[in-house]
Amino acid sequence: MKYYSTNKQAPIASLQEAVVKGLAADKGLFMPMSIKSLPQEFYDTIDTLSFQEIAYRVADAFFGEDIPAETLKQIVYDTLSFDVPLVKVSENIYSLELFHGPTLAFKDVGGRFMARLLGYFIKKEGQKNVNVLVATSGDTGSAVANGFLGVEGIHVYVLYPKGKVSEIQEKQFTTLGQNITALEVDGTFDDCQALVKSAFMDKELNEHLSLTSANSINVARFLPQAFYYFYAYAQLKRAGKADNAVVCVPSGNFGNITAGLFGKKMGLPVKRFIAANNRNDIFYQYLQTGKYSPRPSIATIANAMDVGDPSNFARVLDLYGGSHAAISAEISGTTYTDEQIRETVKETWKDHHYLLDPHGACGYRALMDGLQSGETGVFLETAHPAKFLETVEGIIGEAVEIPAKLQEFMKGEKKSLPMSKDFADFKKYLLAL
C-alpha cells in the first residue's frame, strides 16, 4: 500500500517510509492510497470472532501487502494483550472501556502497535539509534513510552508541558529510565507539538539524527485505533443491539475519531458519529460555520482534549474531499464546559454507579443529549478515572480506588530534564546527543 500526503506536494511513500518519517516532506499527514471494504461475511460473523481475530482482519486490510502474515499476526496479538469490554451504563448507552491496557488509556492500542511495527522495520533494515519524538498532554506519553520500553535500537523523547499533566500521568513516563527520556517543557501542549514538528522540518537535525514521531500524526499510531470500533460493533451484535449504532468520541487531536471514520469507510455499520469537545471547540465551530479557525488551547479538566489546532483535522477533511456538507452529514459535534463535565460525572455516579473520567463524561453526556429513538449509543471511555484522581475525587466526594498497575508507577522516582519552548534550545540538545 502506498501513502500520499494530505498537502499533495510530497512524493508517494511506502508504509515503511510513512511510519519512519511520521510527517510528509510538505508538512502534510500521510493517508493510504485506498481504503479496502471488508466483505459482508466478515460483518455477518463478526460476533463469533475474538478481539484479536477481528483486529487482524482489519490490520490485514491496511498493512497486509507490506508485512508478512505471521509477523503482522504476532504484532496484533502482542499489542492486544488486554480486553476492551463494552459495558452498559444506562438505557441504550454503552461505554467502550479502553483503559484495561498497561497505562490505562486508549492510546495503549496505537502505542503498542506502533512500537512493534517500527521495531520490525528497524530490525529488517539493520538500523540502530532511531529517535522517537513525542509530544504529550498526558496519556500519549505514557502509552508510547511503555509501548517502546526496551525495544532495541529505539530511544524515545517525551515532551510534556510543565505543570499541566496530572501527577499519575507524569509518573507513567518519567519513572521508566532505560530508553525513555522525559523533557519537561516550559510551555503548553501546543508548544510541545510545535517543537516536535519543527524538529522534523529541520534539515540539519535530520542529517545528524534518525527521527520519527509517535503522535497520532503517525499512520502506525492512529490506524490500529480502528480495531476497537469493529470490536465494539461485534459486542453490540452479540447483545442484539447493533442496529442504528451511534458512536461518540471525546475529541482532542482527532486521531481517535479519524480511525473510526476509516472503519465506516471499510463498511463498519455505524449510523453516525458525534465528536465531543470540551471548551476547545474548534471542530464544533467548524461544523456550525464551515470555517476552520484554530486558536490557542484553553486549560480544562478534560486536559487530553485541550487542543487548539487538531492535527488530524487535515485527515478528516481529506477523507471527505474537503466537503463541509459531507463531513456534517456523518459527524455532529457537542461542546461542554468544566461545570457540565463535573455535573455529568457526579450524576452518572449517583444514578448508575458508573464512574466516568472527565473525557468519557463528554462522550456520555453527548449521547444523553443527542441520542434519537431507536438508536444505541456507544461512547469511548478513553482513560481510567483514577488517572484524574484529584479531579474525580473532588467531584464525587469519595476516594477512588487506584488500580494496581497505577500504584506501581506511583512508587517510581520522577526523572525529567527541563526544556524551554524555544526551538533553538531543543535543537541544541538534540544535536549534542
Model-inferred region functions:
Residues 1-433:
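PLP-dependent amino-acid enzyme catalytic core
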